[in-house]
Amino acid sequence: MKILYISPENTVGTLNLWKHIHEKNGHNCRFITFFPSPKKYGDDICLNLPFDFTKKRLANWRHQFYKIYRGRTGYYTEKKGYPPVWTPEGKIDKLFFIMKDVTWKRKVEKSIDNFDLLNFDVYHFESGMDFFKDSSFAQKIKKRGKKIICHYHGEDLRTRGVMPELDAVSDLNLTSEVDLLGKHPNINYLFLPFDTDSFTTKQKLNNPVRVCHAPTNRYYKGSAAIIAICKKLVSDGIIVFDLIENLPHKEALNRKLEGDIFIDQIGDKGGWGYGMNSVESLSMGICTLTMLNETYQNFIPDHPFVNVDETNLENKLLFLINNPEQIKIHGNKGKEWVVQKHHYTNVGKKLYEYYQKDGIVN
Protein backbone atom coordinates (compact mmCIF):
# COMPACT_ATOMS: atom_id res chain seq x y z
CA MET A 1 0.00 0.00 0.00
CA LYS A 2 1.19 3.53 -0.83
CA ILE A 3 0.37 6.29 1.67
CA LEU A 4 0.78 10.04 1.13
CA TYR A 5 0.64 12.77 3.77
CA ILE A 6 -0.21 16.27 2.55
CA SER A 7 0.52 19.01 5.07
CA PRO A 8 1.17 22.76 5.26
CA GLU A 9 4.44 22.00 7.05
CA ASN A 10 6.22 19.41 9.20
CA THR A 11 5.43 21.33 12.37
CA VAL A 12 6.54 19.04 15.21
CA GLY A 13 8.23 16.18 13.34
CA THR A 14 5.29 13.78 13.38
CA LEU A 15 5.38 13.35 9.60
CA ASN A 16 8.77 11.65 9.90
CA LEU A 17 7.34 9.32 12.54
CA TRP A 18 4.25 8.47 10.49
CA LYS A 19 6.51 7.58 7.59
CA HIS A 20 8.54 5.33 9.92
CA ILE A 21 5.37 3.72 11.35
CA HIS A 22 3.94 2.88 7.92
CA GLU A 23 7.23 1.57 6.60
CA LYS A 24 7.55 -0.71 9.66
CA ASN A 25 4.12 -2.06 8.69
CA GLY A 26 5.41 -2.89 5.22
CA HIS A 27 3.94 0.05 3.32
CA ASN A 28 5.44 2.83 1.23
CA CYS A 29 4.94 6.32 2.67
CA ARG A 30 5.87 9.83 1.58
CA PHE A 31 4.92 13.31 2.76
CA ILE A 32 4.61 16.56 0.85
CA THR A 33 4.58 19.96 2.55
CA PHE A 34 3.68 23.41 1.30
CA PHE A 35 6.37 25.18 3.34
CA PRO A 36 9.76 24.24 4.87
CA SER A 37 9.75 22.92 8.42
CA PRO A 38 10.18 25.98 10.68
CA LYS A 39 12.06 24.01 13.34
CA LYS A 40 14.34 22.26 10.83
CA TYR A 41 12.72 18.82 10.93
CA GLY A 42 13.53 16.84 7.84
CA ASP A 43 11.32 17.47 4.82
CA ASP A 44 10.47 14.88 2.17
CA ILE A 45 8.85 16.69 -0.78
CA CYS A 46 8.72 20.41 0.02
CA LEU A 47 6.99 22.73 -2.45
CA ASN A 48 8.29 25.90 -0.76
CA LEU A 49 5.20 27.86 -1.78
CA PRO A 50 4.51 31.55 -1.07
CA PHE A 51 2.01 32.90 1.51
CA ASP A 52 3.24 30.96 4.54
CA PHE A 53 0.86 32.13 7.26
CA THR A 54 2.69 30.07 9.87
CA LYS A 55 5.33 32.82 9.85
CA LYS A 56 4.82 35.41 12.56
CA ARG A 57 4.62 38.50 10.34
CA LEU A 58 2.01 37.03 8.00
CA ALA A 59 0.11 35.43 10.89
CA ASN A 60 -0.10 38.78 12.66
CA TRP A 61 -1.21 40.50 9.43
CA ARG A 62 -3.97 37.92 9.02
CA HIS A 63 -5.02 38.35 12.65
CA GLN A 64 -5.29 42.13 12.31
CA PHE A 65 -7.15 41.83 9.00
CA TYR A 66 -9.69 39.39 10.42
CA LYS A 67 -10.57 41.87 13.17
CA ILE A 68 -12.54 43.67 10.44
CA TYR A 69 -14.85 40.65 10.18
CA ARG A 70 -14.59 38.91 13.55
CA GLY A 71 -14.04 41.73 16.04
CA ARG A 72 -11.38 42.19 18.70
CA THR A 73 -10.19 38.57 18.80
CA GLY A 74 -9.60 38.53 15.03
CA TYR A 75 -8.36 35.25 13.59
CA TYR A 76 -8.36 33.66 17.05
CA THR A 77 -12.17 33.85 17.22
CA GLU A 78 -13.60 30.34 17.33
CA LYS A 79 -16.12 29.57 14.60
CA LYS A 80 -19.52 28.13 15.39
CA GLY A 81 -20.97 25.05 13.79
CA TYR A 82 -20.91 21.26 14.11
CA PRO A 83 -18.57 21.12 12.38
CA PRO A 84 -17.53 24.72 11.79
CA VAL A 85 -17.29 25.28 8.02
CA TRP A 86 -14.80 27.50 6.20
CA THR A 87 -16.09 30.26 3.97
CA PRO A 88 -14.30 33.42 2.79
CA GLU A 89 -14.85 36.27 5.25
CA GLY A 90 -15.59 38.85 2.54
CA LYS A 91 -14.76 40.02 -0.97
CA ILE A 92 -11.10 40.81 -0.22
CA ASP A 93 -10.62 37.46 1.50
CA LYS A 94 -12.25 35.63 -1.41
CA LEU A 95 -10.12 37.43 -4.00
CA PHE A 96 -6.96 36.68 -2.04
CA PHE A 97 -7.63 32.93 -1.98
CA ILE A 98 -8.45 32.91 -5.70
CA MET A 99 -5.14 34.68 -6.37
CA LYS A 100 -3.27 32.32 -4.03
CA ASP A 101 -4.63 29.22 -5.75
CA VAL A 102 -3.71 30.62 -9.17
CA THR A 103 -0.20 31.39 -7.89
CA TRP A 104 0.24 27.89 -6.47
CA LYS A 105 -1.37 25.97 -9.33
CA ARG A 106 1.55 25.57 -11.72
CA LYS A 107 4.02 24.40 -9.08
CA VAL A 108 1.52 22.06 -7.45
CA GLU A 109 0.45 20.45 -10.73
CA LYS A 110 4.07 20.00 -11.77
CA SER A 111 4.77 18.21 -8.47
CA ILE A 112 1.69 16.02 -8.90
CA ASP A 113 3.13 14.82 -12.21
CA ASN A 114 6.78 14.63 -11.12
CA PHE A 115 6.07 12.60 -7.97
CA ASP A 116 3.12 10.60 -9.36
CA LEU A 117 0.90 11.87 -6.54
CA LEU A 118 -2.31 10.55 -8.11
CA ASN A 119 -1.15 6.96 -7.71
CA PHE A 120 -1.15 6.50 -3.94
CA ASP A 121 -3.78 4.41 -2.17
CA VAL A 122 -4.34 6.37 1.04
CA TYR A 123 -4.12 10.14 1.47
CA HIS A 124 -3.78 11.91 4.82
CA PHE A 125 -4.73 15.59 4.64
CA GLU A 126 -3.09 17.15 7.68
CA SER A 127 -5.14 20.07 9.05
CA GLY A 128 -7.90 18.92 6.70
CA MET A 129 -6.28 20.95 3.94
CA ASP A 130 -5.96 20.34 0.20
CA PHE A 131 -3.48 22.14 -2.05
CA PHE A 132 -6.41 24.30 -3.20
CA LYS A 133 -9.34 25.91 -1.39
CA ASP A 134 -11.89 24.10 -3.57
CA SER A 135 -10.31 20.74 -2.59
CA SER A 136 -10.10 19.83 -6.28
CA PHE A 137 -7.18 17.42 -5.73
CA ALA A 138 -9.11 15.51 -3.05
CA GLN A 139 -12.18 15.30 -5.26
CA LYS A 140 -10.07 14.00 -8.14
CA ILE A 141 -8.49 11.18 -6.10
CA LYS A 142 -11.84 10.28 -4.54
CA LYS A 143 -13.26 9.67 -8.02
CA ARG A 144 -10.35 7.25 -8.52
CA GLY A 145 -11.45 5.26 -5.47
CA LYS A 146 -8.73 6.45 -3.10
CA LYS A 147 -9.12 6.55 0.69
CA ILE A 148 -9.02 9.95 2.39
CA ILE A 149 -8.17 10.80 6.02
CA CYS A 150 -8.35 14.28 7.53
CA HIS A 151 -6.30 14.92 10.68
CA TYR A 152 -7.15 18.10 12.60
CA HIS A 153 -4.70 19.68 15.03
CA GLY A 154 -6.54 22.61 16.62
CA GLU A 155 -6.65 26.03 15.00
CA ASP A 156 -7.63 24.42 11.69
CA LEU A 157 -11.01 23.31 13.07
CA ARG A 158 -11.48 25.92 15.81
CA THR A 159 -10.92 29.13 13.87
CA ARG A 160 -10.97 28.07 10.21
CA GLY A 161 -13.46 25.21 10.00
CA VAL A 162 -13.60 22.19 7.72
CA MET A 163 -13.13 22.67 3.99
CA PRO A 164 -16.62 21.55 2.92
CA GLU A 165 -15.67 19.72 -0.28
CA LEU A 166 -12.89 17.81 1.49
CA ASP A 167 -15.01 17.01 4.54
CA ALA A 168 -17.66 15.56 2.22
CA VAL A 169 -15.27 12.95 0.78
CA SER A 170 -13.28 12.09 3.93
CA ASP A 171 -13.40 8.43 4.98
CA LEU A 172 -11.87 9.00 8.42
CA ASN A 173 -11.37 12.07 10.61
CA LEU A 174 -8.75 12.17 13.35
CA THR A 175 -7.59 14.60 16.01
CA SER A 176 -5.09 14.73 18.86
CA GLU A 177 -7.00 17.59 20.54
CA VAL A 178 -9.69 16.64 23.05
CA ASP A 179 -11.77 19.79 22.55
CA LEU A 180 -12.11 19.03 18.83
CA LEU A 181 -14.05 15.86 19.66
CA GLY A 182 -16.98 18.16 20.39
CA LYS A 183 -16.64 20.12 17.16
CA HIS A 184 -17.25 17.40 14.56
CA PRO A 185 -19.94 14.69 14.49
CA ASN A 186 -17.58 12.07 13.07
CA ILE A 187 -14.07 12.36 14.50
CA ASN A 188 -11.76 9.99 16.40
CA TYR A 189 -9.01 10.62 18.94
CA LEU A 190 -5.40 9.61 18.38
CA PHE A 191 -2.49 10.42 20.71
CA LEU A 192 0.43 12.24 19.12
CA PRO A 193 3.19 9.77 18.16
CA PHE A 194 6.65 10.29 19.61
CA ASP A 195 9.90 8.39 20.01
CA THR A 196 9.72 8.34 23.80
CA ASP A 197 12.96 6.32 23.94
CA SER A 198 14.95 9.30 22.62
CA PHE A 199 15.84 10.54 26.11
CA THR A 200 16.99 9.01 29.39
CA THR A 201 15.06 9.98 32.52
CA LYS A 202 16.46 12.99 34.37
CA GLN A 203 17.92 11.98 37.75
CA LYS A 204 19.65 15.03 39.26
CA LEU A 205 18.04 18.40 39.92
CA ASN A 206 19.72 21.76 39.44
CA ASN A 207 20.34 24.12 42.33
CA PRO A 208 18.51 26.42 42.11
CA VAL A 209 15.72 24.60 40.28
CA ARG A 210 15.60 25.38 36.56
CA VAL A 211 12.13 26.14 35.13
CA CYS A 212 11.54 26.14 31.35
CA HIS A 213 8.77 27.44 29.10
CA ALA A 214 8.82 27.02 25.31
CA PRO A 215 5.80 28.72 23.70
CA THR A 216 5.13 28.47 19.98
CA ASN A 217 2.39 31.08 20.46
CA ARG A 218 2.49 33.25 23.58
CA TYR A 219 -1.17 34.20 23.33
CA TYR A 220 -2.35 30.60 23.20
CA LYS A 221 -0.08 29.44 26.03
CA GLY A 222 -0.82 32.26 28.48
CA SER A 223 2.88 33.10 28.39
CA ALA A 224 2.56 36.68 29.67
CA ALA A 225 1.43 35.46 33.10
CA ILE A 226 3.88 32.54 33.13
CA ILE A 227 6.82 34.81 32.35
CA ALA A 228 5.77 37.40 34.94
CA ILE A 229 5.46 34.80 37.71
CA CYS A 230 8.76 33.14 36.83
CA LYS A 231 10.61 36.47 36.64
CA LYS A 232 9.33 37.27 40.15
CA LEU A 233 10.73 33.97 41.44
CA VAL A 234 14.02 34.68 39.65
CA SER A 235 14.26 38.09 41.33
CA ASP A 236 13.67 36.37 44.68
CA GLY A 237 16.59 34.02 43.92
CA ILE A 238 14.35 30.95 44.00
CA ILE A 239 14.65 29.63 40.44
CA VAL A 240 16.51 29.95 37.16
CA PHE A 241 14.07 30.60 34.31
CA ASP A 242 14.73 29.61 30.70
CA LEU A 243 12.37 31.00 28.04
CA ILE A 244 12.93 28.88 24.92
CA GLU A 245 11.69 30.51 21.71
CA ASN A 246 12.40 30.76 17.99
CA LEU A 247 15.15 28.13 17.92
CA PRO A 248 15.87 25.12 15.70
CA HIS A 249 14.30 22.07 17.26
CA LYS A 250 17.58 20.38 18.21
CA GLU A 251 18.79 23.45 20.09
CA ALA A 252 15.43 23.83 21.83
CA LEU A 253 15.56 20.18 22.96
CA ASN A 254 19.04 20.62 24.40
CA ARG A 255 17.79 23.59 26.42
CA LYS A 256 14.76 21.65 27.68
CA LEU A 257 16.98 18.75 28.76
CA GLU A 258 18.68 21.11 31.22
CA GLY A 259 15.39 21.87 32.98
CA ASP A 260 13.83 20.40 36.12
CA ILE A 261 10.31 21.75 35.66
CA PHE A 262 8.55 22.48 32.37
CA ILE A 263 5.48 24.74 32.08
CA ASP A 264 3.35 24.12 28.99
CA GLN A 265 0.32 26.42 29.29
CA ILE A 266 -2.12 27.97 31.78
CA GLY A 267 -5.18 28.56 29.61
CA ASP A 268 -7.50 27.06 27.02
CA LYS A 269 -7.17 29.79 24.39
CA GLY A 270 -5.41 27.67 21.80
CA GLY A 271 -6.56 24.20 22.72
CA TRP A 272 -6.90 22.24 25.90
CA GLY A 273 -4.31 20.48 27.98
CA TYR A 274 -0.99 19.73 26.38
CA GLY A 275 0.81 19.18 23.11
CA MET A 276 4.14 18.06 21.71
CA ASN A 277 6.06 20.34 24.06
CA SER A 278 4.77 18.33 27.01
CA VAL A 279 5.25 15.01 25.24
CA GLU A 280 8.93 15.91 24.86
CA SER A 281 9.38 17.02 28.48
CA LEU A 282 7.57 13.95 29.83
CA SER A 283 9.84 11.76 27.69
CA MET A 284 12.81 13.47 29.36
CA GLY A 285 11.44 12.60 32.81
CA ILE A 286 10.85 16.28 33.57
CA CYS A 287 8.08 17.36 35.94
CA THR A 288 5.52 18.97 33.64
CA LEU A 289 2.93 21.61 34.52
CA THR A 290 -0.10 22.48 32.41
CA MET A 291 -3.74 23.44 32.75
CA LEU A 292 -6.22 20.58 32.47
CA ASN A 293 -9.90 21.45 32.64
CA GLU A 294 -12.41 19.02 34.12
CA THR A 295 -13.28 17.43 30.76
CA TYR A 296 -9.62 16.78 29.99
CA GLN A 297 -8.96 15.35 33.46
CA ASN A 298 -11.83 12.91 32.95
CA PHE A 299 -10.45 11.98 29.51
CA ILE A 300 -7.00 11.08 30.93
CA PRO A 301 -7.67 10.40 34.65
CA ASP A 302 -4.29 8.68 35.08
CA HIS A 303 -2.35 11.73 33.81
CA PRO A 304 1.02 12.69 35.38
CA PHE A 305 0.71 16.48 35.08
CA VAL A 306 0.77 19.08 37.82
CA ASN A 307 -2.45 20.93 37.04
CA VAL A 308 -1.98 24.72 37.14
CA ASP A 309 -3.68 27.94 36.19
CA GLU A 310 -2.82 31.62 36.54
CA THR A 311 -4.17 31.79 40.10
CA ASN A 312 -2.13 28.90 41.55
CA LEU A 313 0.99 28.62 39.36
CA GLU A 314 3.25 30.50 41.76
CA ASN A 315 2.14 28.51 44.81
CA LYS A 316 2.49 25.17 43.03
CA LEU A 317 5.98 26.10 41.83
CA LEU A 318 6.94 27.05 45.39
CA PHE A 319 5.55 23.74 46.70
CA LEU A 320 7.62 21.75 44.20
CA ILE A 321 10.76 23.77 44.89
CA ASN A 322 10.35 23.21 48.64
CA ASN A 323 9.63 19.50 48.08
CA PRO A 324 12.15 18.44 45.42
CA GLU A 325 11.28 14.76 45.82
CA GLN A 326 7.89 15.62 44.29
CA ILE A 327 9.65 16.96 41.19
CA LYS A 328 11.31 13.56 40.75
CA ILE A 329 8.11 11.62 41.47
CA HIS A 330 6.15 13.56 38.85
CA GLY A 331 9.02 13.21 36.38
CA ASN A 332 9.23 9.43 36.77
CA LYS A 333 5.46 9.00 36.56
CA GLY A 334 5.40 11.17 33.46
CA LYS A 335 8.00 9.02 31.72
CA GLU A 336 6.01 5.84 32.32
CA TRP A 337 2.76 7.45 31.18
CA VAL A 338 4.11 9.01 28.00
CA VAL A 339 5.59 5.69 26.85
CA GLN A 340 2.22 3.99 27.32
CA LYS A 341 0.19 6.68 25.54
CA HIS A 342 2.51 8.30 23.01
CA HIS A 343 5.19 5.81 21.93
CA TYR A 344 4.92 5.67 18.16
CA THR A 345 4.47 1.88 18.15
CA ASN A 346 1.37 2.12 20.35
CA VAL A 347 -0.05 5.08 18.41
CA GLY A 348 0.60 3.28 15.12
CA LYS A 349 -1.38 0.26 16.33
CA LYS A 350 -4.32 2.51 17.13
CA LEU A 351 -4.17 4.16 13.71
CA TYR A 352 -4.29 0.77 11.99
CA GLU A 353 -7.28 -0.19 14.15
CA TYR A 354 -9.07 2.85 12.73
CA TYR A 355 -7.91 1.84 9.24
CA GLN A 356 -9.54 -1.57 9.62
CA LYS A 357 -12.68 -0.26 11.32
CA ASP A 358 -13.32 2.30 8.55
CA GLY A 359 -12.36 0.05 5.65
CA ILE A 360 -9.10 1.82 4.79
CA VAL A 361 -7.35 -1.56 4.78
CA ASN A 362 -8.74 -5.07 4.80
How should each PLM-predicted stretch be described?
Residues 4, 201-221, 227:
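Conserved donor-binding/catalytic core segment of Leloir-type glycosyltransferases
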Residues 2-7, 96-100, 113-132:
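Short N-terminal targeting/anchoring amphipathic segment
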Residues 122-128, 138-157, 173-175:
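Active-site proximal beta-strand in glycosyltransferases
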Residues 149, 156-157, 167-201:
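Donor nucleotide-sugar binding/catalytic pocket of nucleotide-sugar-dependent glycosyltransferases
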Residues 325-356:
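A charged, aromatic-enriched C-terminal amphipathic alpha-helix characteristic of glycosyltransferases
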Residues 281-290:
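Short hydrophobic beta-strand element within catalytic cores of glycosyltransferases
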Residues 1-47:
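N-terminal subdomain of nucleotide-sugar transferases
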